Amino acid sequence: FGTCISGCTDQSATNYNPLATQNDGSCVFPPCTAPAPTHETFSTGLMPIGVCSPNQWEISATTGDGWRFTGNPGYNASTFSGNNRSVGSFSWIDFSGTDVDPVLEVEDIDVSSLTSSALFFDYFSDLGTSSCAANNILHVEAFDGTTWNSVAVLQLNATGWNTYGYELTGFENGTTAQIRFRGESSGLSCDFYNDLLIDDVKIEEAVYGCTDAS
């Protein structure tokens, strides 16, 4: 009846054995990444579906319901107030309850095709006419293969939506960008006035030039 040769029979595996006649379960697959440039618009009202099915985007929280993808934020972040974007077209944290370490992790991005990778995103942190001594905090972090490192910390009050960009050189895990957004309360009892929103998350080529409008 011939000789059975055990080994990996899946051609997409890194240890594929073309001589194997029986799969022994030893297949090893390369890590799945989405190729840069990428652009997430949060337009479905659901957590994004990543390139690596079923879903490489992740959310987590120590306490609270964490990042949301639908529903209407409160106070000036409401779509009926200072926020001019439609419900279900951005991601946000509701600080009306207790939220600790709400994390939104972006799918892994292969940046090997970029000369200098950068992260861009739109951010909304606007108290409007409400009063609070300090705004809630957005931590932007990158994983280098060992630990999460701080790319930026945003604790600010700015009118409406604003775009922020950060070069990722030195923050990558080899040729992979692993990014997460972590929101934290200011710790003040008035933190519920300041829901935090993000939109249009992009990882693409860094753009250099003069940024002084004067």
How should these model regions be labeled?
Residues 90-102, 154-159:
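Extracellular beta-rich ligand/substrate-recognition surface
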Residues 111-115, 124-134, 187-188:
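Extended, low-complexity, turn-rich repeat/linker tracts enriched in Gly/Pro/Ser/Thr and Asp/Glu
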Residues 95-114, 163-165:
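Short beta-strands within extracellular/lumenal beta-sheet-rich domains
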Residues 42, 121, 165-191:
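Extracellular beta-strand ligand-recognition surfaces/modules
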Residues 147-172:
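Extracellular carbohydrate recognition and processing domains
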Residues 35-93:
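Extracellular glycan-recognition surfaces and repeat-rich motifs
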Residues 97-103, 131-132, 186-205:
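Extracellular carbohydrate recognition
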Residues 1-51, 110-111, 116, 193, ...:
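Primarily marks secretory-pathway-exposed extracellular/lumenal segments that are disulfide-
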